[in-house]
Amino acid sequence: RDTDRSRGLGDVYKRQEQEQGTQRTEQGQGEKPEPESPEEPPLVENWDLIEITRAEVGNSNYEELLYLASLAGLVNRSSPEIFLHSGQAYVKWMTEMKASGYTFTKKSLSEITSLFLNRAKGYVLVDDKLEKTYIAASLAGVLDAVILTTDLASKAPYNSLQKLADVRDKDEAWLADYIKQHSSQFNLNAIVNNASFPWTMVDFAIANRYPWCSNAKSDDAVLQKLYYMLKPNSPHYGWGVPYNLERMDVRFGCEHNGVYTVPGINTMSLSILSSKQLKPYDRPASPVEVPARTGVHYATIVFSDGDNTSYMLDLFSRNTYISHPRAHEIPLTWMYPPTLRTNMVPVHNWYQKNLPATNCYVGALSGAGYTFPSHHEFVADYFRMTNGMLKDCGMQYMVLMD
């Protein structure tokens, strides 16, 4: 997980696109959940995860939720243990994981703290408004630390921890210099950003020691400096920099070191969903090639938002879309990010098992992640990487958007 640069984000969320005033919102809230898919033979044995929901944690400013997410990142780095979720879609993926040999035990925040706080070497102090979460998460990963606000740090049992860093007065320029000076400690195969929810994706970033960029408008020069510290053709997980506008956000990355975007802003427990202990299930290739008819124009309906892992985790798994009982009646095409195969393994496995025979998957925009090929700095290498990922998922085609 830490060395494969072809991983694209995986995460759970809702993406709001502001380009041209367009906004996508979830639909089908009243749909009944679809039946559970048939159980597969267990792929792992005796993995007992601790389950805790977002509603059971935190207060109005989410300081406890941020702390727990940072602790989960440290703990899940070596083996999957803490599954933090918000219910709804996550319960579905828990069901999928149970079929692979996982069990879940509910525990409270205090119980989890007593079990795992000793895994942290100390804490990183963040401002009470959580505006510097991106700096704190960057440092917490390499310092093996949890993230605490001033209020939490003054309370037991957290006050027994050593303060390893205080980022309340730091900015993104300071962070860029820190990453450059300590580059060997970071995993520079990816960068993370979250413009809307400071507690989400924290576990994933800390578990993998990924750096973060700002959760506000970034300075172009500083962001460019951060992007060129990464390995070429690395993913940017999240959404929202530098201008919180789709074209500028995506285009800026692909123009600078081939950084491609894997959208998703509300993801929790990605360190669990991408666990190496979960094995991807790949749909066997069709043994028969269907010959094309001559004199016929082929067309298909393509369901989009397949690049947005928020939708892949939740909306597309409802009865409204690919799991609808009548989806098999006509040929349909579904955009599917091949990065799910390693970043959100239960989600990938569900899509692979539940594709109707009349339907097909194509790689999402534009391949491994969201990029504009005509602006992509290392586009040839990017598509070579994408081609391998598509083959792993049994796909022959991808959607190109420029």
Q: Where in the sequence are the language-model features?
A:
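Terminal accessory/targeting
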Residues: 14, 32-341
